[in-house]
Design a protein with these regions (language model features):
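Acidic, polar ligand-binding/catalytic clefts
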Residues: 79-115, 194-197
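Sec/Tat signal peptide C-region and signal peptidase I cleavage site
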Residues: 15-23
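Ligand-binding clefts/hinges and TM-proximal coupling segments of bilobed small-molecule sensing domains
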Residues: 138-155, 227-290, 294-296
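N-terminal (or domain-start) structured segment
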Residues: 24-92
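Pocket-lining segment of extracytoplasmic ligand-binding domains
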Residues: 86-88, 97-98, 127, 164-260
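Bacterial N-terminal signal peptides
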Residues: 7-16
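An extracytoplasmic/periplasmic, membrane-proximal ligand-sensing/linker region
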Residues: 172, 176, 182-183, 193-211, ...
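Bilobed "Venus flytrap"/periplasmic-binding protein-like clamshell domains
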Residues: 26-52, 56-57, 113, 117-183, ...
Length: 319
């Protein structure tokens, strides 16, 4: 009896030691506002790479202010990784664009290019906004400070000859902007993200909004000026009652710090492109189908993390 009890105690102690030896790793993915596309996609990826896909890993999607805030959080150690627009990541790494005059974020590294983010200019029906130029004199939200959308909105306004002084500018999260459009206290707002965006779909279902085209020579000039931007079309009926809309797009990227462990990021990258992750992405969000391994290093702009680079070499995406 005593021997049996002793054996049980030894086994229990051994399990406790083993449990302590395999401590959990927590890995945050900073995303964006809960009404956008980053947050649900981040949740799908976090679930796909967590234990058992990567042993002892607990990944979580964290709501945030968006691209600029995510890069700053990674740099400051407030997040292990995050989503960023390709232009914001490049500007941060090189100390140019919106990061001009600030220290370069030289440790910023790419895990994967994810999907194209489409520029949305959402306008209240009855506000008589048919083009970007019609925003003059209107109440317009450019998104909140720290977001990539704010950077893009300012670039778009400038391209069409509209200054912030020409509009009644507000700086709101997309869901808050949508609520103000709904109660007629805002005329339009910018959103950059994968379609369909849930908050915009809800607005469109009421029949109260239009998606305004961002096209023409002004858009073509932006594409030539910024290599990250591409001509895009939001297909008809993506949003109820809205026809096909010409617009622009920029790549959404998953970025991290060079300081993150090489083996850990290798395993995370491998899990991202596993069959289980594929099923989750395909079934979990309309934009999930656009996240494909073949495009993982397209339009990189910043260096790959050593762990991600190792994986892409193994599967033949890199030589």
């Amino acid at each position: 009896m005593k021997r049996t009890l002793l054996a049980a105690l030894i086994a229990t102690a051994g399990l406790a030691l083993a449990s302590g030896a395999s401590a959990q790793n927590f890995f945050r993915i900073n995303t964006g506002g809960v009404a956008g596309t980053y947050y649900p996609i981040g949740g799908l990826i976090a679930n796909a790479i967590s234990q058992p896909a990567v042993p002892n890993l607990v990944a979580t999607a964290v709501a945030s202010n968006g691209s600029v805030a995510n890069v700053n959080a990674i740099q400051g150690g407030g997040a292990e990784s995050g989503f960023s627009q390709a232009d914001v990541a490049y500007w941060a790494y090189t100390g140019t664009g919106t990061f001009e005059g600030k220290p370069k974020v030289t440790d910023l590294r790419l895990i994967a290019n994810l999907y194209p983010e489409s520029f949305h200019l959402v306008a209240r029906k009855g506000a008589n906004i048919k083009s970007v130029g019609d925003l003059k004199g209107k109440r317009v939200s450019l998104d909140e400070p720290g977001s990539g959308t704010l950077v893009n909105a300012r670039a778009i306004l400038a391209a069409y000859g509209v200054s912030e002084k020409d509009i009644k500018a507000e700086f709101l999260k997309p869901n808050a902007a949508g609520e103000k459009v709904k109660d007629n206290s805002l005329d339009a707002y910018f959103f950059v993200g994968g379609y369909p965006a849930g908050a915009i779909a809800e607005l469109a279902a009421t029949g109260g909004v239009d998606i305004v085209s961002i096209g023409g020579p002004e858009a073509e000039k932006l594409v030539k000026q910024f290599g990250f931007y591409a001509v895009d079309t939001i297909p008809a009926d993506t949003y109820k009652g809205v026809g096909a809309v010409k617009t622009l797009a920029v790549g959404a990227q998953w970025v991290t710090s060079a300081k993150q462990d090489t083996t850990l990021v290798y395993n995370i990258t491998k899990a991202l492109w596993s069959d289980n992750a594929r099923k989750a992405l395909d079934s979990g969000h309309a934009k999930g189908k656009a996240i494909v391994r073949a495009g993982a290093i397209a339009g990189a702009g910043i260096p790959l993390h050593a762990g991600a680079e190792k994986f892409y070499k193994e599967v033949g995406l890199l030589k």
